[in-house]
Swiss-Prot record:
Name of the featured protein: ATP synthase subunit alpha
Top-level taxonomy: Bacteria, Bacillati, Actinomycetota, Actinomycetes, Frankiales
Source organism: Frankia casuarinae (strain DSM 45818 / CECT 9043 / HFP020203 / CcI3)
InterPro entries, alphabetized: ATP_synth_asu-like_sf, ATP_synth_asu_C, ATP_synth_asu_C_sf, ATP_synth_F1_a_nt-bd_dom, ATP_synth_F1_asu, ATPase_a/bsu_AS, ATPase_F1/V1/A1_a/bsu_N, ATPase_F1/V1/A1_a/bsu_N_sf
Keywords: ATP synthesis, ATP-binding, Cell membrane, CF(1), Hydrogen ion transport, Ion transport, Membrane, Nucleotide-binding, Translocase, Transport
Segments of this protein annotated with the region Disordered: 516-552
């Protein structure tokens, strides 16, 4: 029988080989917390000591929560989804991910929720990447002045409160005054730029619906689709029945999608409809998290809520690609009170405001823009020169008209100059009326406003102003096409162009018929001939001589 011998070297080599080849596949470390309190879309979690601010936490059933309050031994989270199945004692796990949104051109033409998930039933979206929602806005040195116009197609805005690429222009007014309509028309007006195929002209749009009814959001989608504008628009929807957390993060998701295009050297337009509901959702979240309330029960950082959002709108420097993000935030007022807390906050953040007044809306002035309280701090630097040359007189005439209109309400006798000013102002107000979904190209706007401010419409009855404008602009396009071409190519209203417009107005007035069937310009009646200038033929008359019998 052979003796079994094991050498120590063999044992050592075997152990070393086993240790070197060992791979730990099941060993790992995971932080697990537990739900302490839950309700009203809020959950308090104990444990998870290494959680980061704005980190996503995973609850039972895969529901996500956003860590907002990092307290000693406890975390206050906002549930981003259905919270009915979340109960006390359930486990909560860290994801290690900061709140972010997928971005890319695949989102154009789609409707998504505030987490970037499609909700339009058109399948999954292939994202080009993701972008964190809480990132620093561009610094001062990374920006350049706003100087390129962004045409909205709305005469009253493009003429008197011009918007430039990279600007933040507030749309403010009571409910049911046409705020959403103005924003949607601005999106629709980018259609021609999109179809041109020129990246320097194209503007990609994002519409963020916060706290809106689902039927209202459906109407917006239909309006954009019918106008051919959905192809370059992304809609981020947080309807009224969604949790407060979705309404809170929806604007940041929309801005993340738009910023992706801006940092790629492209141009984007974002509409926040409306930030009042986001502030109310943030107030509800803060009160449930027991943050100390301030004015109107809003938390102390509600200003920062909107400032860090709107500061992301910018015109980047050429070194960063020269992209731009233009913001149109919407704020809803109560009883036209623009001095309330949230309206004054956003007014101080933005670069101007368009104030829509309910009284004007009820009078049939659509869009119901109050030119006295509406302003653009960018001013004429964001206007083409042709528009700038005619818009200054328009604002002055309308301001004088409003002042005289209030004075004339007392029944005082007015001199002829005042009556003429009132008559022209009434025609200018009628000229600025514009139907929904029919934006005007800038060259047609310039011609229309030129005709109004130079008195060419003073002899046209107010009831016929809009029909005269429509037919006259079409007449110029047919008979004087060089007018529009000159404005588009040069951006100016030259003396030669004005001379052509003078001829066009005079010619068109001769063929325009009023609503009562009478011609606008009566042809002068032919004057009678001067008898002194008429040569008459003289015929000699031969009378027979009188007979002698007749003499007797």
């Amino acid at each position: 029988m052979t003796e079994l011998s094991i050498r120590p070297e063999e044992i050592r080599d075997a152990l070393r080989e086993y240790v070197d080849s060992f791979q730990a596949t099941s060993a790992g470390r995971e932080e697990v917390g537990r739900v302490v309190v839950t309700g009203d879309g809020i959950a308090r979690v104990e444990g998870l000591p290494h959680t980061m601010t704005n980190e996503l936490l995973e609850f039972h059933g895969g529901v996500l929560g956003l860590a907002l309050n990092l307290e000693v031994g406890e975390i206050g989270t906002v549930i981003l989804g259905e919270s009915e199945n979340i109960e006390e004692g359930q486990e909560v796990r860290r994801t290690g991910q900061i709140l972010s949104a997928p971005v890319g051109d695949g989102f154009l033409g789609r409707v998504v929720d505030p987490l970037g998930r499609p909700i339009d039933g058109l399948g999954e979206i292939v994202a080009e990447g993701s972008r964190e929602l809480e990132l620093q806005a561009p610094t001062v040195v990374q920006r350049q002045p706003v100087k390129e116009p962004l045409q909205t197609g709305i005469k009253a805005i493009d003429a008197m409160t011009a918007i430039g690429r990279g600007q933040r222009q507030l749309i403010i007014g009571d409910r049911q005054t046409g705020k959403t309509t103005v924003a949607i028309d601005a999106i629709i007006n980018q259609r021609d730029n999109w179809t041109s195929g020129d990246p320097s002209k194209q503007v990609k749009c994002v519409y963020v619906a916060i706290g809106q009814k689902k039927s209202t959001i459906r109407e917006v989608v239909n309006s954009l689709e019918e106008a051919g504008a959905l192809a370059y628009t992304t809609i981020v929807a947080a309807p009224a029945d969604e949790p407060a957390g979705f309404k809170y993060i929806a604007p940041y998701t929309g801005s993340a999608i738009a910023q992706h295009w801006m940092y790629n050297g492209q141009h984007a337009l974002i509409v926040f409809d409306d930030l009042t509901k986001q502030a109310e959702a943030y107030r509800a979240i803060s009160l449930l998290l027991r943050r100390p309330p301030g004015r109107e029960a809003y938390p102390g950082d509600v200003f920062y809520l909107h400032s860090r959002l709107l500061e992301r709108c910018a015109k980047l420097s050429d070194e960063l690609g020269g992209g731009s993000l233009t913001g149109l935030p919407i704020i809803e007022t109560k009883a036209n009170d623009i001095s309330a807390y949230i309206p004054t906050n956003v007014i101080s953040i933005t670069d101007g405001q368009v104030f829509l007044e309910s009284d004007l809306f009820n009078q049939g002035v659509r869009p119901a823009i109050n030119v006295g309280t509406s302003v653009s701090r960018v001013g004429g630097s964001a206007q083409v020169k042709a528009m700038k040359s005619v818009a200054g007189r328009l604002r002055l005439d309308l301001a004088q008209y409003r002042e005289l209109e209030a004075f004339s309400a007392f029944g005082s006798d007015l001199d002829k100059a005042s009556r003429d000013q009132l008559a022209r102002g009434a025609r200018l107000v009628e000229l600025l009326k514009q139907p929904q979904g029919q934006p005007f190209p800038v060259e047609r706007q310039v011609v229309s406003i030129w005709a109004g401010t130079t008195g060419k419409l003073d002899d046209v009855p107010v009831a016929d102003i809009r029909r005269f404008e429509s037919e006259f602009l079409d007449f110029v396009g047919r008979s004087y096409p060089g007018v529009y071409d000159a404005i588009v190519t040069t951006g100016k209203l030259s003396d030669d162009t004005i001379a052509m417009l003078e001829s066009a107005v005079a010619e068109f007035k001769k063929q325009f018929t009023l609503s009562d069937g009478k011609p606008l310009v009566n042809e002068p009646a032919p004057s009678p001939l001067d008898p002194g200038l008429v040569r008459q033929e003289s015929i000699p008359v031969h009378r027979p001589a009188a007979r002698k019998d007749d003499e007797g």
